From Swiss-Prot:
UniProt KW keywords: Acetylation, ATP-binding, Isopeptide bond, Kinase, Nucleotide-binding, Nucleus, RNA-binding, rRNA processing, Transferase, Ubl conjugation
Organism expressing this protein natively: Bos taurus
E.C. code: 2.7.1.78
Name assigned to this protein: Polynucleotide 5'-hydroxyl-kinase NOL9
Family statement: Belongs to the Clp1 family. NOL9/GRC3 subfamily.
Length: 694
């Protein structure tokens, strides 16, 4: 008896897993877990077994001494502990929300070759990488802010590795008075053409009210095929990653051409961004005559372009058209780089810029990816393009990420000239300081070409009634005076990017080259026809005396002008001057014109004997009849286009290692190569690698 009492006193001091072992039977594992258990190390195996035993014994009530408590005694003890908690002065815990629990996503079911069916419970999201065609068979889903409902056309979705992964979210939708049985019967009928009986039964076992069913199909486009045909660019859409979860869902998604990703890799917007978008969408849809002009500004790599795409898709859910004014020369959204354009967007934007190159309503080829050397021409081009806006649809204005020093003054000029109704200003903890662009701040600041609303000298007293009677000097009267009245909206950004000060320029250059490739893909025949090499396509022959020439970004001697045009990216433009009166050419312009640009092309050759330019372009012939000017800027043909010319023997045309840097304009022609060489000569210290600790 004494020994038993002594044992009872020692029991509480023992470890929990020892008590669990005595109270419960020995843990039985199946064959596969036992095999995994043998492969673990001794310490990991011991830790795993302890956790399993603790989980197995979690439901047992303990009494000092190791004996189980009867049901009545356990109930009495629970009531006693509840009374103690009620009488305790400590604050109560937060109540658990009483809303319905979010159900898990069932496995994706194969629906034939290159097709799969996905069931999403309400509130769940499917994050993926790759490209596919999304059709909503039942319910309603949202991708990148655009809502896809049952019966609507399929949408091409591009979730690339150059940007954040996209997510298919199941959203709430209105249901007429139907029982769960009727909804289930309707969904089963819709699934009959796609799934066999067994897969249909397994999928419908996870059916719940307000869930959505999506059909994922393999997507093949000439744009994707053309981009991945170049060496080193296939990783943009598909990346083979080693996985340990090889099951039926893995093979079903692989046949579609996508891969399931973790939720944390998907696109995430802050609450402030959603609040701003909700207000802007409400203003655009509820008021019939309201066409807000929304200017989005902030420093670079803070998420402005992502916000603009999401906002466009949100607006297209309620309005038929959204206008878009592109003022960012380096990272354009719908055109090749170096352009200022105005577009009418009627289709959702479900991918990065190089997947949705479109024809603008009005476009001017500025010819550079930055305006730092010619602010006045930049302002004049924006005024020229903005004059075509008819105020029939909401307008989104995208601005540059240069908001320091002169860039801030230039932004103030844009706000005054474009007169937006709403200004969305982005900020983050890691971005440089940017003042709040309130209407009062803008009115009290001088821009580069506009001046503040009032310039009253401070004479030691404040008498606003005498402000109009004061006389100013001539230099104080220069520049137009424009007052602003808009609503300032703030977005706190938590956008995470892999760009740094060292790799930002190379990263941006890759995105610009992808945009050019996306534009050139319009030369390819539609799928399923095979791709054709660019040097195998028939170019247009343009006489010297039919078009004028101008090099925008540099001063080139007239004797070397054709060297600069050959094998260059050219803008096909329309000028008001008549150039048909010249007997021979080339015809050179003395200054860069501000004129309409109908598209772009490649000057793949010049015939000096017949005096012909050979132009390769996707612009239709009816538009080419009006082209009478070729503009050459700092935007170059991607190197992969020149290097990957198949079917050629010997040296590749336009690719050489012997280059004369003394030619006028030679340094501007290869500015990117020079900057890369300068970067290597600086001798930056090698990056240090640290081991991660957990």
């Amino acid at each position: 008896m004494a020994d038993s009492l002594l044992l009872l006193k020692r029991v509480p001091s023992r470890h929990t897993w020892l008590r669990a072992r005595k109270a419960r039977p020995q843990l039985m594992l199946s064959r596969r877990p036992r095999r995994r258990l043998r492969n673990l190390r001794w310490r990991s195996r011991r830790r795993l077994r302890r956790r399993l035993l603790q989980a197995q014994a979690a439901g047992a009530d303990w009494l000092q001494g190791g004996c189980l408590v009867s049901g009545d005694a356990a109930l009495q003890r629970l009531k006693t502990s509840a009374r103690r908690r009620a009488s305790s002065p400590e604050p109560a815990e937060d109540p658990v929300p009483s809303g319905p629990a979010i159900l898990p996503i069932p496995p994706v079911r194969p629906a034939g070759s290159g097709r799969a069916v996905l069931l999403l419970p309400l509130g769940q999201g499917f994050t993926f990488s790759g490209i596919c065609c999304v059709t909503c068979l039942y319910g309603q889903v949202q991708v990148f802010g655009f809502t896809i409902s049952q019966g609507q056309p399929a949408q091409n979705v591009f979730s690339t590795y150059t940007h954040s992964r996209l997510t298919i979210n199941a959203v709430h939708y209105s249901v007429h008075e139907k029982s769960k049985k009727e909804m289930k019967r309707e969904a089963r009928v819709l699934l009959r053409p796609y799934l066999n009986q067994d897969d249909r039964y397994c999928l419908m076992s996870s059916f719940s009210p307000l869930c959505s069913i999506v059909l994922l199909e393999r997507l093949k486009t000439s744009t994707v095929n053309f981009i991945i045909s170049h060496p080193g660019l296939s990783y943009i859409f598909v990346q083979e990653v080693r996985t340990f979860q090889i099951n039926s869902e893995y093979f079903a998604l692989r046949s579609v051409g996508i891969r399931r990703e973790k939720k944390k890799t998907g696109l995430r917007l802050t609450e402030s961004a959603f609040a701003v978008m909700e207000e802007l969408v409400s203003i655009s849809s509820e008021e019939a005559d309201s066409c807000p002009v929304i200017l989005v500004c902030g420093c670079q790599d803070i998420g402005k372009s992502t916000f603009n795409r999401y906002l466009i898709n949100q607006l297209l859910n309620s309005v038929s058209c959204v206008d878009y004014l592109e003022c960012d020369l380096g990272q354009t959204e719908f055109t090749p780089p170096g352009c200022i354009s105005l577009l009418n967007i009627t289709e959702p934007v479900l991918g990065p810029p190089f997947t949705h190159q479109r024809t603008p309503q009005k476009m001017v080829y500025y010819g550079k990816t930055s305006c730092k050397n010619n602010f006045e021409n930049y302002i004049e081009v924006i005024k020229y393009v903005f004059s075509s806006y008819k105020r029939e649809s909401p307008l989104i204005i995208n601005t540059m990420g240069w908001v320091a020093d002169q860039g801030l003054l230039l932004l103030i000029d844009l706000i005054r000239l474009l007169s937006p109704s709403h200004v969305v200003q982005f900020s983050s903890d890691r971005s440089k300081y940017m003042p709040d662009l309130t209407p009062d701040f803008v009115d009290d600041m001088d821009g580069l070409y506009t001046r503040r609303r009032s310039r009253v000298r401070n004479r030691g007293f404040h008498l606003p009634e005498f402000a109009e009677s004061l006389e100013f000097a001539d230099e104080e009267k220069e520049g137009p005076v424009m007052s602003t009245g808009y609503k300032l909206m703030f977005v706190k950004s938590e956008f995470v990017t892999g760009k740094t000060s060292r790799n930002r320029e190379s990263h941006n250059r890759i995105l610009r080259e992808l945009a050019v490739l996306g534009y050139l893909s319009q030369l390819q025949p539609p799928v399923p026809k095979p791709l054709r090499a660019l040097h195998g396509l028939t170019p247009y022959q343009v006489p010297f005396n039919a078009v004028a020439l101008r090099i925008i970004h540099a001063d080139v001697a007239p004797t070397h002008i054709l060297y600069a045009v050959n094998a260059s990216w050219v803008g096909l433009c329309k000028i008001l001057d008549d150039v048909r009166g010249y007997a021979s050419g080339p015809i050179l312009l003395a200054q860069s014109p501000i004129c309409d640009c109908v598209g772009f092309g490649i000057c793949r050759g010049i015939d000096m004997e017949k005096k012909l330019y050979h132009i390769l372009t996707p612009v239709p012939p009816e538009e080419l009849r009006h082209v009478n000017c070729l503009l050459v800027g700092a935007v170059n043909i991607p190197q992969c286009v020149l290097k990957s010319q198949g079917g050629l023997e010997g040296t590749i045309p336009y690719v050489t290692t012997d280059y004369n840097f003394k030619l006028p304009g030679a340094s501007e022609k290869i500015g990117a190569r020079e900057s890369g060489a300068t970067y290597k000569e600086k001798g930056h210290p090698k990056p240090k690698f640290y081991r991660k600790t957990y």
